[in-house]
Amino acid sequence: MANEFRVCDDCKAPNLKTLIPRLKKLDPDAVIKIGCQSYCGPGRKKTFAFVNNRPVAALTEDELIDKIAERLKKR
């Protein structure tokens, strides 16, 4: 089963122009869904993504990518 990344295009913290290519690099076969994730509170302060329906958040995009990579290794 392919991994799924969900990211928000409304929140202020995630920069989709840089985040999506980095997610594709982590897992080229993953499904990436873009749209509101109803995670507005944290999404204003931290960059985040949902990885296989689990939220992952960090203060920077680099930290987020590291956390997502760890999450994928556990799978």
Swiss-Prot record:
Family from the record: Belongs to the UPF0741 family.
Short name of any one Pfam family annotated for the protein: DUF1450
HAMAP family linked to this entry: UPF0741 (MF_01863)
InterPro entries (UniProt xref): DUF1450 (IPR009910), UPF0741 (IPR020880)
Top-level taxon: Bacteria
Name of the molecule in the record: UPF0741 protein GK3412
Provenance organism: Geobacillus kaustophilus (strain HTA426)
